[in-house]
Amino acid sequence: MFSKSVTLAQYDPDLAAAIAQEDRRQQDHVELIASENYVSCAVMEAQGSQLTNKYAEGYPAKRYYGGCEYVDIVEQLAIDRVKELFGAAYANVQPHSGSQANQAVYASVLKPGDTILGMSLAHGGHLTHGASVNISGKLYNAVTYGLDENEVLDYAEVERLALEHKPKMIVAGASAYALQIDWAKFREIADKVGAYLFVDMAHYAGLVAGGEYPNPVPFCDFVTTTTHKTLRGPRGGVILCRDNTHEKALNSSIFPSLQGGPLMHVIAAKAVAFKEALQPEFKQYAKQVKINAAVMAEELVKRGLRIVSGRTESHVFLVDLQPMKITGKAAEAALGKAHITVNKNAIPNDPEKPFVTSGIRIGSAAMTTRGFNETDARVLSNLVADVLANPEDEANLAKVRGQVTALCDKYPVYGN
């Protein structure tokens, strides 16, 4: 029998100490990694619940195990809420990650060797959109499109490649593209060649939910998203469709093809996050995310930095560091010393290796969750610029670190 009175700190002080240190880091550092965010205490409570004890292979009312009457309620809540959130007719909330959701979409209608057309990883796409190092680039014949000379998504190239290669599926969505994507244009191109249209909106889902980014669901055969990032939920994935045409194929692609039992505690946490995203205040959050990102990009331009694509229309943008003679790896390290967390990121036509890069990626989702407004975003962008101007000056880094501490103390991640 387990005792509820025994704490983690009592049972495993080493692990508890590491968690406490990470908690302190999150409080003391400004998080600007575009794929990260903070979840609510309610989300964490659901994910840490007794639901982790329950195996539930199958789907609500169609399980391979007994005792699933209550987890059925949990999963159905998540399904109903995410369908309402994005206007979808079909939803599968069981994918353990966005990558597995994407794999399931491919497996539902494609055969090995079929051609897919996706955004190049080097131009802002994602590994799972056909990159050669990913299973999607090994199982399928992946053709890639990219950005034009103005660093805008090249729809003419997408159409040209689609007409030339006749892909069975066109993949839209990105992990490092700042501008809005024209889903209707992608639908038009897909229809010209009889291709399925699949959108991975993992980075933009929270903005879509908040009405600050176009909703791809009405235009697509398949839509996937992660449930963290801008959506502010637990780490996991979701598949959505505008109708139920592919319901059977998608469900079987997840279970039993790619996964076994669903993570019911995570699905419960997803349900909480979906409820939060349905509230009016989430729309204000999404609006502020876009405002903060735009302000930061504009302020960095004023400080002489170059923003890929020239601006942002979302939560994310890339900074080209080549004019400053500093790599993304070095910039990430210097900013980290100042308690500003970013990730190094390749820019279009990057001459550096992927583990070095010539750029950094900046996102505003997590800082906005803390309560940062446009005034704070302006201050923060100047602190970033200060570090990049003198990345090896320890006195400069210490000065910036002190200013970051003041900002973080003003906006605690979790209040009382």
Swiss-Prot record:
Q: Please classify the protein's predominant subcellular localization into one broad category.
A: cytoplasm
Query: For this protein, what is the EC number?
Result: 2.1.2.1
Q: Which GO terms describe its cellular component?
A: cytosol
Q: Which domain of life is it from?
A: Bacteria
Q: What are the GO BP annotations of this UniProt entry?
A: glycine biosynthetic process from serine; tetrahydrofolate interconversion
* Catalytic reaction equation(s): (6R)-5,10-methylene-5,6,7,8-tetrahydrofolate + glycine + H2O = (6S)-5,6,7,8-tetrahydrofolate + L-serine
Localization, per the record, is: Cytoplasm
Q: Which Pfam families does the record match to this protein? A: SHMT
Q: Which PROSITE patterns match?
A: SHMT (PS00096)
Cofactor names from the entry are: pyridoxal 5'-phosphate
Q: Which residues carry this modification: N6-(pyridoxal phosphate)lysine?
A: 229
Q: Which keywords, in A-to-Z order, does the entry hold?
A: Amino-acid biosynthesis, Cytoplasm, One-carbon metabolism, Pyridoxal phosphate, Transferase
The UniProt subunit note reads as follows: Homodimer.
Query: What is this protein's record name?
Result: Serine hydroxymethyltransferase
Organism name? Neisseria gonorrhoeae (strain NCCP11945)
